[in-house]
Amino acid sequence: MLKGILTVAMGILFVVQLHGQDTPTDYLSADFHKERREKVRELMSPNSVLVFFANPERNRANDVDYIYHQDPDFYYLTGYREPNAVLLVFSESRQNTRGEPYNELIYVQERDAKAEQWDGKRLGVEGTKEKLGFKMVFNGDEFSAIPVDFSSFDTVSFFDFENDYRDKPGEADLFDLIKTFKQKANYPADYGAKKQELYSMITSTPIENSANVAQILGRYLNNYPNLQGDELLKVFANSTDEAVRKEIREKVLIVQKTNNLDSAMISEIMNILRETKTEEELVLLKKAIEISAVGQIEVMKAMHPNMSETEIQGVHEYVYKKYGAAHEGYPSIVGGGNNGCILHYIENNKPKVGNDLVLMDLGAEYHGYTADVTRTIPADGTFSKEQKAIYDIVYHAQEAGIAASVVGAAFQAPGTAASEVVAKGLLKLGIIKEVSEARTYFPHGTSHYLGLDVHDKGTYGAFKPNTVITVEPGIYIPEGSDCDKKWWGIAVRIEDDILITEKGPVNLSVMAPRTTEAIEAMMKQPSPLDDFVLPSLD
């Protein structure tokens, strides 16, 4: 229902911005990005270079592309939000032919009046210097003449090239930048950057946390069939013996030393840096989370059984836009009834949610930083006896998970605490007969890092201060489950964004009601949308 309004409103906003000069002023500062690059250098090995490429432009259909989203690592280090760029960070200062010192180079897309008339203004070389504080900036077509001998470095570290990048005619684009880099770095045809990245995950994680890494590797192997033939990855992922994982770790370390091309160091450094947030980052992340919490509140007030999943999604996303969050951090999940049992349900096309529970997992992205907040509410405003029984188990599981989210605790501590509560609760209700069966109805992990990515980068080690994680237990009982039919179609997930501090966990999304009593009370509040009626269409 609200999508028509959003389309018109966004059209008006576009006209205003096209002719005006006002843009948001609360992005990360140039000093932030510069300081992050200095932190990168502190963690680099001697005589090394890190190479970061901008994200590719992605095609939606025919001649229409998706809205461009910068690679989070590239944005983190540069603040540059355009495509077709490459950043080089050197471990030590160098000199160019004019004797000028430098420790970083950035190549950006060239100013082009015709292209800018159609697609928006570009920073270009001078804008990148002025706005982002870089000194050594060049047009992308100059990268082919880069005065750097990659063979002279002990380590040339970069992320993989598995993204779909197109070769556009004319200007130097991402395709050309990557092609040039591969030629100059003697990139072998059989190099497996994703494999090297997973090797890095093995070697950079303390052996006592290797069980968690093994689980992650198992998921990667399922998603990347070309990696399934790698014996080191396969044995590590399938081993339950820490001694075996330690032996594989030593073998991986040997393999990593065979040439100067590497995907380990760059991955390890970015995992370390992005795991903990600076105060400047926390300002933006907190705003994204608060916006998302307000979205949940406004939907609670507006909810009624005749609403569609799409309409509910539209209310959330209108709130985001109203507060200046231009995008969502990930595809919005709005699942009524049995649809909520699909963990990543994004169709959101049920015409009426009826009297079911509605699971809403959404997050606003504010200036690159994304929230991830989930609430589950009864469409008719009142929890049934069965719905409340399941909800209360999940609520108490989340409380246990949040309480376990303290400095020094293992990354899996919230999940362990939450899982115990879920298992006991399901046993008490008679939904399961053995503790091991709880995994049937709670099949996912409880936490992930949060930041520039909804599943942000980190080391998966002990919790550190200024880390932001999610705590999101859930119970999902799809139709046809091996339990009493009265439980079928009930899906509950509660997800909050938690800041780890020396004084204990801080719930950044606490504004959105979590208890059944608080939710029901909020749903009785009037909504600005109560009197909003669109004309019917034939």
Predicted regions, residues:
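Bacterial N-terminal signal peptides that target proteins for export
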Residues: 1-6
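Bacterial N-terminal signal peptides
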Residues: 7-17
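Active-site neighborhoods and metal-handling regions in enzymes and metal-associated proteins
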Residues: 21-538
